């Protein structure tokens, strides 16, 4: 097994409520290598989304250190926002519960744009949609397809950027059981084929059981 794509050491995050500081994450450490998947579970408010936001630089650390693909970030550090933005552009793919497609672009053009921004203009963007089962909808717009089809396109968009790490925050949370299972099948199959690392935040224990490792935030604070 190679070096971790993602390594977290002593991560802490909290917020002020009234006159008190409430701890959300405390002294958390973890690592995920290429080809591995980690499920993050826990009760509502346990910090699942907060953790994923920290892992891609959308929130700042109170304490600790995060390293992604060799880039290291501490609670304080000059130029962190610029470095995080570059990682999100080229290295970290993020899949949200709410589909993050541009409504004015077709599914195919959404994938092409994401691939271009990551510097991976390979011409294989349509193939990614086909691999995710929405090749026939490639020229349709997000509001012309079902929620499940749009989420598949969002997953295709992330894989097209050839990320080292994928962060998926409740990617099937808004879908019915059948569609959720289909999207999850696609996500895990392609993740294993490409060998990227995956961190999946979910309340769905069945989905979490498909990952290599489990982190239950309900027991960490």
For every predicted segment, state its role:
Residues 19, 73-93:
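ABC ATPase NBD coupling module
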Residues 56:
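Helix-to-loop junction immediately C-terminal to a conserved catalytic motif
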Residues 64-75:
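Conserved ABC transporter NBD signature motif
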Residues 105-112:
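Short coil-to-helix segment of the ABC ATPase nucleotide-binding domain corresponding to the Q-loop/switch region
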Residues 141-145, 149-151:
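Conserved ABC ATPase signature
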Residues 160-164:
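A short, proline-enriched helix->beta-strand linker immediately N-terminal to the Walker B motif
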Residues 166-169:
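Catalytic Walker B motif of ABC-type/P-loop ATPase nucleotide-binding domains
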């Amino acid at each position: 097994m190679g070096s971790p794509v993602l390594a977290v050491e002593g991560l802490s995050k909290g917020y002020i409520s009234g006159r008190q500081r409430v701890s959300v994450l405390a002294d958390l450490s973890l690592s995920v290598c290429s080809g591995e998947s980690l499920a993050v579970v826990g009760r509502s408010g346990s910090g699942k989304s907060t953790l994923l936001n920290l892992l891609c630089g959308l929130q700042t650390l109170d304490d600790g250190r995060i390293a992604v693909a060799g880039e290291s970030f501490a609670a304080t550090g000059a130029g962190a926002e610029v470095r995080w933005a570059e990682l999100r552009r080229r290295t970290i793919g993020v899949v949200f519960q709410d589909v993050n497609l541009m409504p004015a672009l077709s599914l195919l053009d959404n994938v092409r744009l994401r691939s271009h921004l990551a510097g991976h203009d390979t011409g294989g963007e349509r193939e990614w949609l086909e691999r995710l089962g929405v090749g026939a909808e490639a020229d349709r717009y997000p509001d012309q397809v079902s929620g499940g089809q749009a989420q598949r396109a969002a997953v295709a968009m992330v894989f097209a950027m050839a990320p080292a790490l994928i962060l998926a925050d409740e990617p099937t949370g808004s879908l019915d059981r059948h569609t959720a299972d289909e999207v999850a099948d696609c996500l895990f199959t392609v993740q294993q084929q490409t060998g990227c690392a995956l961190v999946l935040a979910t309340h769905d224990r069945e989905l979490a059981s498909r990952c290599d490792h489990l982190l239950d935030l309900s027991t960490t604070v």
